[in-house]
């Protein structure tokens, strides 16, 4: 779809959506997003120019269907997939991608760390994906030197970052906010550093006794990104990994640096969103969202969860969806899903489905709470179908139609029950929705009350 759109831009020094928006140009991607979000083109252009909305759209991702991440658009959901040295292969990752897109992922991140040819799996995912693809390049940078921190140099990072851009990656998590002076702040934590990318860079700084190369070479990364329109997802290396560590000095020190890096990227006309925690008690979620908006000048916020309790391994898609719904309500632009396997193992395709549905619920609930135009239309339509016992319509409107039909049919599988005015919960005689209160019923009731000298029904 985009091949003809981007053909004229190739070779330009800066092809980012932010660059065009600041020149007053409405790109085809902005027009597409405006129609998709039911927003005026001018508003989309203004939000992109201001940095409050990004359209991750690498010029080398030709089959991408453009989408927006920002406060003015609907709350989005990212699904993480990726192979590890211990599990998965290319076919398995493509199956996860297919399921993620089927169940509504707005973006997908390939977090492969090994076990497969990383370039092969990434290009296969990009070529098969209509949604933006994100990556964490430090994983491959370390893999390229066979896991040897001592052999990893600054140019290795930049080489991998540009390779990902050339392959069509739409946004990259760049852990540039973790500085060498932040490392002492980690000592008082219960769980230390829980970001894999952050852990790699902390090891690099401790071994080489030098500043984070992604920070010192940040302007070079900006120069790479603007040639491809790759967006920054500024990584939160010091996100809290437990309730105890939430909103601590380490997290907030890095957030301040991320705010400064946001401005530096904007100075290059490069699009930016900022990643956030993590594990956060419910009473601290609003503070975290407001603080990010303040420090990062309202750049889109992209949070992992946050998990609101740490005692439910196997159910962290639930513990985190609670926090995600709240974060979305307070203004977070995109939610990164968590699967039931979080903290336990590599997710399989069914885990992807479970995590994604939990987060689509959270994002949709946030849109309703924020009174986004049309956000509740589907809810109202399903409610009408429920009241009218239109079972097939209910299934069709569900976030997971297959699961809804499966649960209904476990006890009432025959087709005749798709017209029944009950389910197996209440049975044929006790469903309250069978009670239809009509105007005729109310007129009869009012006449009866009047004949007995009772008060009239309220209007």
Swiss-Prot record:
Any one GO cellular component localisation term in the record: cytosol
Cofactor binding note of this UniProt entry: Binds 1 [4Fe-4S] cluster per subunit. The cluster is coordinated with 3 cysteines and an exchangeable S-adenosyl-L-methionine.
Alphabetically ordered keywords of this record: 4Fe-4S, Iron, Iron-sulfur, Lyase, Metal-binding, S-adenosyl-L-methionine, Thiamine biosynthesis, Zinc
Record protein name field: Phosphomethylpyrimidine synthase
UniProt keyword annotation of Lyase present: yes
GO biological process, one term: thiamine diphosphate biosynthetic process
General function of this protein: Catalyzes the synthesis of the hydroxymethylpyrimidine phosphate (HMP-P) moiety of thiamine from aminoimidazole ribotide (AIR) in a radical S-adenosyl-L-methionine (SAM)-dependent reaction.
Binding annotation for Zn(2+): 279, 343
Keyword 4Fe-4S found: yes
Pathway listed: Cofactor biosynthesis; thiamine diphosphate biosynthesis
Cited PANTHER family: PHOSPHOMETHYLPYRIMIDINE SYNTHASE, CHLOROPLASTIC, THIAMINE BIOSYNTHESIS PROTEIN THIC
Swiss-Prot/TrEMBL catalytic activity: 5-amino-1-(5-phospho-beta-D-ribosyl)imidazole + S-adenosyl-L-methionine = 4-amino-2-methyl-5-(phosphooxymethyl)pyrimidine + CO + 5'-deoxyadenosine + formate + L-methionine + 3 H(+)
Gene3D superfamilies from the UniProt entry: 6.10.250.620, Radical SAM ThiC family, central domain (3.20.20.540)
Coiled-coil regions listed: none
GO molecular function: 4 iron, 4 sulfur cluster binding; carbon-carbon lyase activity; zinc ion binding
Chain residues that bind substrate: 80, 109, 139, 175, 195-197, 236-239, 275, 302
Domain of life (superkingdom): Bacteria
Named cofactor requirement(s): [4Fe-4S] cluster
Protein family (similarity comment): Belongs to the ThiC family.
EC number: 4.1.99.17
Residues that hold [4Fe-4S] cluster according to the record: 423, 426, 431
């Amino acid at each position: 779809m985009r091949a003809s759109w981007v053909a004229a831009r190739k070779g330009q020094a800066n092809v980012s959506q932010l660059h065009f928006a600041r020149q007053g140009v409405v790109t085809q991607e902005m027009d597409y997003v405006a129609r998709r979000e039911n927003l005026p083109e001018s508003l989309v252009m203004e939000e992109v120019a201001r940095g409050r909305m990004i359209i991750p759209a690498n010029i080398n991702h030709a089959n991408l269907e453009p989408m927006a991440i920002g406060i003015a658009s609907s709350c989005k959901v990212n699904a993480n997939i990726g192979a590890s040295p211990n599990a998965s292969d290319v076919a398995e990752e493509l199956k996860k991608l297919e399921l993620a897109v089927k169940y509504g992922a707005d973006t997908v991140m390939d977090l492969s760390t090994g076990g497969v040819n990383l370039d092969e799996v990434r290009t296969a995912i990009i070529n098969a994906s209509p949604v933006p693809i994100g990556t964490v390049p430090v994983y491959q940078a370390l893999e390229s030197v066979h896991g040897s921190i001592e052999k990893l140099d600054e140019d290795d990072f930049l080489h991998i970052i540009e390779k990902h851009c050339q392959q069509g990656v739409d946004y990259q998590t760049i852990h540039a906010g973790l500085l060498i002076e932040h490392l002492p702040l980690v000592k008082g934590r219960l769980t230390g550093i829980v970001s894999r990318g952050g852990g790699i860079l902390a090891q690099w700084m401790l071994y080489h006794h030098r500043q984070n190369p992604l920070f010192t070479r940040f302007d070079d990364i900006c120069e790479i990104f603007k040639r491809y329109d790759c967006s920054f997802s500024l990584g939160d290396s010091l996100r809290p990994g437990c309730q105890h560590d939430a909103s601590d000095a380490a997290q907030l020190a890095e957030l301040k640096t991320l705010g400064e890096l946001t401005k530096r990227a904007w100075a290059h006309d490069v699009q930016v969103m900022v990643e956030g925690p993590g594990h956060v008690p419910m009473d601290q979620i609003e503070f975290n969202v407001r603080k990010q908006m303040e420090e990062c000048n309202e750049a889109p916020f992209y949070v992992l969860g946050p998990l609101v309790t740490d005692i439910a391994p196997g159910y962290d898609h639930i513990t985190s969806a609670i926090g995600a719904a709240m974060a979305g309500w307070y203004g977070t632009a995109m939610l990164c899903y968590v699967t039931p396997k979080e903290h336990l193992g590599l997710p399989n395709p069914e885990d992807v489905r479970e995590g994604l549905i939990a987060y689509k619920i959270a994002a949709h609930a946030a849109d309703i709470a924020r009174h986004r135009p049309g956000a509740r239309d589907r809810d109202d339509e399903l409610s009408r179908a429920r009241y009218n016992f239109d079972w097939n319509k209910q299934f069709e409107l569900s976030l997971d139609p297959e699961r809804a039909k499966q649960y209904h049919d476990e006890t009432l599988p025959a087709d005749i029950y798709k017209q029944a005015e009950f389910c197996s919960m209440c049975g044929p005689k006790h469903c309250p929705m069978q009670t239809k209160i009509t105007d005729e019923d109310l007129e009869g009731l009012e006449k009866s009350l009047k004949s007995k000298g009772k008060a009239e029904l309220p209007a």
